[in-house]
Amino acid sequence: MDAISYERAGDVAGAVRAAQQPGAVFIGGGTNLLDLMKGGVARPVRLIDITHINGLDTVTTLPDGGIRIGALVRNSDAANHALVREQYPLLSQALLAGASAQLRNMATVGGNLLQRTRCGYFYDTAFTQCNKRTPGSGCAALDGRNRTHAILGASPQCIAVNPSDMSVALAALDAVVRVSGPAGERTIAFADFHRLPADRPDVDTTLRPGELITAVDLPPPLFSAHSHYLKVRDRASYAFALVSVAAALQMDGERVQTARIALGGVAHKPWRASAAEQMLNGQPLSQATLKNAAAAALSDARPQHENRFKVQLAQRAIVRAVNHAAARDGGVA
């Protein structure tokens, strides 16, 4: 077993300083990190425990009417918080669709943002071809088992998908990630937080070395009355999405004022279906228009030999999610 040192950070500045040491990583709930360590995928030499930093485990209202969710808020607490349930039911649904109750009780919002892919070739170090684990080694999934892999935004270097349900909802809601690092504090628009693989699939996010996620900000609630998170998976119990859809609408009678649609399980990052949104904005919500919008969302899909079904599955999921969102009257069941 590798030797690992441990340090408990007392504040954000101390955590950032400690993270400058080679091989240091932050640990909150640790639900994903421990899996990676046990499998030999992650080999940190120093763990920086951030769970005792005050002020990162609260949900607060912002002056503009939005909310701030601290990075250390547990997934279960975020999902069941009154402000989230009432004003951002889409996020509550997505959080409750992820993992198991036990994992949600331990996992943090900040850690959820940093989940690594669940690609089997990434997790099994017996497979030496994995550009995400070892850049330049190849991608075993391209010619292997790729039923669960990406159909949008992939590259010849990597076809893995992002596994986070929460992140799909945050993408649709135009969240902002707050971070603190050696150069100070900054914010990252959610659309810019996760990366497509390109030629560096080992880099999942746009975080700079040593930066710590401190919170996620949500804009004022515009979609509390009409939103829905739909997750399609192989079994009803704990499973990652084959396809998921976060749909959020502002409705004026039968007309869509504003549509926000994000997809999960189809790309290296939560995928905003901008083409579908544009086709729905300002239009009456007819089924013909909705089906055309769903087709537009997948027009650039490039499926692999085992996951061609995902294209039609995603289109149908968009139709279902948007129809459900349009009929919804707010809140979480």
Task: For each feature predicted by the language model, list its residue ranges.
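C-terminal structural segment of proteins
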Residues: 1-333
